[in-house]
Amino acid sequence: MNDALFAQLSTLGASLVLLFSFVLLWRRSLHAYVSAFRWQSAVLAGMFVMVGDLGSDPELYFVAAFFLVVKVMIIPRYLDRLEKRVGAERESQPYVNIPTSLIIAGLLVLLAYAITRPLVLASALPTRGGLPLAVGLIFVGLFVIISRKKALTQVVGFLVLENGIALLAMLGTYGIPLIVELGVFLDVLMGFLVMQVFIYHIHGTFESIDVEQLNQLKG
């Protein structure tokens, strides 16, 4: 595979990963959020395989395997189970409505292009075209966290944010050392478990996973 073709494929893959994050903004179903995260992680795992093959870095194959096991199989399954247990099916009243959310997300991606333009122009890596998309994914993940009321949606936003960081690290360094990615996975799993306990406590106290209910604890 020549560098030109690889550059196009890496940019296409990054575009698909970013596209799945927009599902979190234009859909209300929590099940759709989990499915979008699962497919996003699967595409990201495929990108790790592609970069590992071209860069002759077998460690990236292990990273891809971890992505498939942890983020495509284990975490989405737990999220589906959590959704059924707490009875949360829809993000009915987000802080920011859907049309406005999509506009803001588009502006965040444009901001990412503006911020990363000097880096893209200075880089000689064939993966440089996907750098703005990775930064845009991080911005969108952050926006999901702050613009949605359901704790479960915010958990998915956090996971999407971590996918953006992984994508940025892979495209920006042309690969990630296995030990670094293992450390990141451990942090993500610990954060996910803590958030799961947090959601159970919110639901047990308020019979809802709307984080706005936490305002009742004031005073």
Where is each model-derived feature located?
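Alpha-helical transmembrane segments of multi-pass membrane proteins predominantly involved
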Residues: 1-219
